[in-house]
Structures are given as C-alpha cells and as structure tokens.
C-alpha cells in the first residue's frame, strides 16, 4: 500500500465534506464513490485513496490500490484488502453525514512486526464542477523552490480548465531580466486541481509555450556523467557563463559573443519546460526544485514542448501542479548543467484521470508515447523507463509479458533526457504508428 502525507492546511476536509453533503442521502446508507482517507500513523497524518462499490450490503473496490471485499450493515462497514506482497488492511468503520470514520489494521504475514492499528476518517471526492471549462489569466507574484504540498495554492482550477501564466528563468529573472526570486528553478504554482486525489493521474496539455524575451543564459561546463578521465582533464578550465541571443523572427539562437569557431553556429529554437511537477508524497521531506522523481519535477526532457501532454501520478488532494525552468533549446542530457535558460509565456489545460495509477511521469506527443525513468544512475533510470513503458502497454493495450517484450524489442527508442542532476533521466519512446494495429479498445 502507498502512504500519502498531507499537511492539515491542504487537506480541505471541510470543503470536501460540504460538497459531499450537498448530495446528502436520506434513508438507506450508500457509500459508493471515491474517498480520501486521512489516517494517523503514530502522530503523522497520512493520506490514502479508497473506492467503494456497493451492491446491497456487499462492498467491493480498492483501498490504496489493493482489492477489497466487505459488507455494509446499517451504517457499519467492515472490509479486508490484500496486496501482492502479503500485506493486508482490515477496516471497521461507521458512516455518518457522508463521513466514514473508524480504524484500519495494517499487517503483513511475512513481517515479524505485529499488526498496527490506526484511526482514520474519509470524505468523498467531490464531483466535477458543472458548466463549461474556464480560462484563467494568472500573473505570478510568488515563486516556490520546493515541490511541496505545504505551499499554499495560488489558484484553484477544475478539470478541463486552461491557465495562461508565465515563468521566471532558472536563476529567478523575469521577462525583463529583473530578479524576482532566488535562483534554483523557482516555480509558478502550485495550482490546485479540483477532484484530483491520491491514486489519480493528472494530465497537463501544453497548449502554448512561447519565449517572452530575446536572451538566454547558459555556460560551457560539462557534467561529470559525460566525462571520461581524459576529457575531464581537457575540460578543467571550462565553466564560463555564455549568453545567447534568441532570434524569434528566424527561430534560432546564437552566442552573443561567439568563440572563434562558432561565429556562424546557430541552434533552432524549441521552447520547453524543464520542470512540470505535482506535489510529492510528504512521507519524506519535500524535494527541491532541482530534483526529480515519481512526481515529475526537474526532468529537463527536451520533448516537453508545445503540443505535448505530461502525465503525472497524483499523491495529494488537488495534485498541486508546478511549472517552471523554461528552456529556449536543449540538447539531450542537458550536458552543460544548464540549457538555454530563459523566462517563458505558458498556457496549459489540465485534466484528471480518476483511479489511473501510473508508476512515473509519462509524455505523449502527436507521434510518440514516452515513459520517463528518473533514478540515481543511468542504468537504474534505464530500468525505470522500461518498467514504466511496460506498465503502459500492459494497462492500455492489454499486452501480455511476451507481447510487451516483442514490442519493446522491435520498437523501443531510448533517449538520455537528463545527466546533469542528482537523478539521471532515460526516456523510452514508441512511435504510435507501431501501436495502431493493436490499439486499445474504445473507451
């Protein structure tokens, strides 16, 4: 099972309970729906997901992703759930005013530690807001440097809504070159997405990424992962700042003060976001905005461009979406430790895929699906990307392990997306034309 810690100020239990109570049910108790469970683990509040399906007095569904079976007798609930590692959860609770409260016992047959019992309450995830999608114009005044659930949301939006905003560059400078915040990939957000709950997937459709100034900062440094001993010696004197001119009329970037052999060197502009993230699971300390992981973060993947969709696993209510670290262009791996760092004009549309559990970040373009692996070494990132894509093919295309192996063995394209940061990044791409003959069933 997965544990999700969320500070009290962001649990929004009152607002969720009020939304649920608007549809309060007279007469017989019914509990079908998606619930957010708030449990106390030895003094630490944690967050879990629960989905209940009721047929008469019989209950089925999932508790933090584990299949459950149980009963509803009057207003009393009892169910048991089990995971694939012999972990079990047994729940006894009471329903009152659209709130479920009780205890859950966690145990594992293979663990010598005795079972632990924890009190919890659960509230219904509200339904989507009625009416057409909205468009939001948001001008940021505060920028955060952690992908934290403790940061106050700057704006509340609904699935289907579009947000138009801007980002500062990695050093904290805005479109006028004015320092607005300490550097280190300061982020715009977080945006609270209504109905997003632990166990869901947030889809971020990047509808517009445009440069809003004519220069970018970078350097001539080379990251250690890219250097053998001989090249490291040759590169011992590099590390100077390099400023680039961004010519949006011709769509190219050039060094403002080019070295002798780079006087005619140009790079095509391809605006991208180095950071797209949801708030991390705060069972551990919130990661800084230079880090990456299951929550996305500083992925520095150069195909997170206009027209792409980024998928991220939700760990906290509202997802708490962050965007930032705009790049005018970047080669694979971000080998300089920086790309062409610049501020950005950004527009995106958000959506929520309820109950869709993915193991890590994913990206989709008009031509490819792309699974991201982010780990401490390139080898481990390679494995993580492969596992992420295997899950995608299994869940969406219903492929068997043998079929997954055949597809990957004939169609996998791997890219080194990130070599500069604590976590390395590998992306496994598959051209969707290869998958058309085995397209998933229509939903």
How does the language model describe each region?
Residues 130-179:
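N-terminal, Lys/Arg-enriched amphipathic/low-complexity engagement segments
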Residues 269-298, 302-379:
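Conserved mixed alpha/beta catalytic, RNA-binding, or beta-rich assembly cores of soluble enzyme
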Residues 139-148, 180-187, 287-295:
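Short, structured beta-strand/loop micro-motifs enriched in basic residues and often containing a Trp
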Residues 18-116:
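Central antiparallel beta-sheet cores of small beta-barrel/beta-sandwich binding domains
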Residues 1-12:
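Bacterial N-terminal signal peptides
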Residues 170-181, 209-220, 318-328, 417-420:
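Short, Lys/Arg- and Gly-enriched loop/turn segments at beta-strand edges
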Residues 208-304:
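Intrinsically disordered, low-complexity linker/loop segments enriched in Gly/Pro
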């Amino acid at each position: 099972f997965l544990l999700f810690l969320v500070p009290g100020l962001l649990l929004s239990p009152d607002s969720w309970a009020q939304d649920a109570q608007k549809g309060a049910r007279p007469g017989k108790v019914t509990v079908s729906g998606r619930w957010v469970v708030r449990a106390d683990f030895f003094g630490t509040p944690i967050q879990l997901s629960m989905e209940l399906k009721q047929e008469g007095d019989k209950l089925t569904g999932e508790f933090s992703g584990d299949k459950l079976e149980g009963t509803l007798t009057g207003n009393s609930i009892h169910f048991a759930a089990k995971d694939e590692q012999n972990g079990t959860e047994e729940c006894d609770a009471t329903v009152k005013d659209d709130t479920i409260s009780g205890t859950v016992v966690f145990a594992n047959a293979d663990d010598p530690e005795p079972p632990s019992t924890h009190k919890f309450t659960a509230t219904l995830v509200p339904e989507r807001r009625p009416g057409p999608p909205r468009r939001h114009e948001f001008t940021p005044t505060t920028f955060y440097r952690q992908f934290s659930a403790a940061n106050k949301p700057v704006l509340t939006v609904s699935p289907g809504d579009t947000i138009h905003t801007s980002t500062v560059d990695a050093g904290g400078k805005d479109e006028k070159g004015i320092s607005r915040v300490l550097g280190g990939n300061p982020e715009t957000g977080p945006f609270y997405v209504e109905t997003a709950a632990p166990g869901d997937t947030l889809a971020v459709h990047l509808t517009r990424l445009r440069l809003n100034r004519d220069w970018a900062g970078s350097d001539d440094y080379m990251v250690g992962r890219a250097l053998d001993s001989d090249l490291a010696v040759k590169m011992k004197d590099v590390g100077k700042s390099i400023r680039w001119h961004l010519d949006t009329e011709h769509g190219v970037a050039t060094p403002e003060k080019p070295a002798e052999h780079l006087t005619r060197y140009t790079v095509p502009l391809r605006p991208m976001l180095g950071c797209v993230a949801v708030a991390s699971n705060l069972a551990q300390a919130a990661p800084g905005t230079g880090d990456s992981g299951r929550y996305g973060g500083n992925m520095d993947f150069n195909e997170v461009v206009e027209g792409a969709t980024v998928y991220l696993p939700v760990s906290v209510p509202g997802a708490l979406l962050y965007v930032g670290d705009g790049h005018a262009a970047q080669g694979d791996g971000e080998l300089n430790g920086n790309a062409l760092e610049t501020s950005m004009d950004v527009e995106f549309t958000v959506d929520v895929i309820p109950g869709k559990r993915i193991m890590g970040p994913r990206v989709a373009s008009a031509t490819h699906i792309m699974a991201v692996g982010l780990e401490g070494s390139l080898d481990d990132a390679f494995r993580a990307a492969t596992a992420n894509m295997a899950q995608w093919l299994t869940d969406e295309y219903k492929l068997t392990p043998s079929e997954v192996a055949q597809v990957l063995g004939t169609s996998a394209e791997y890219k080194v997306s990130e070599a500069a940061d604590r976590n390395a990044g590998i992306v496994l791409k598959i051209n969707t034309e290869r998958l058309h003959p085995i397209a998933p069933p229509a939903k």
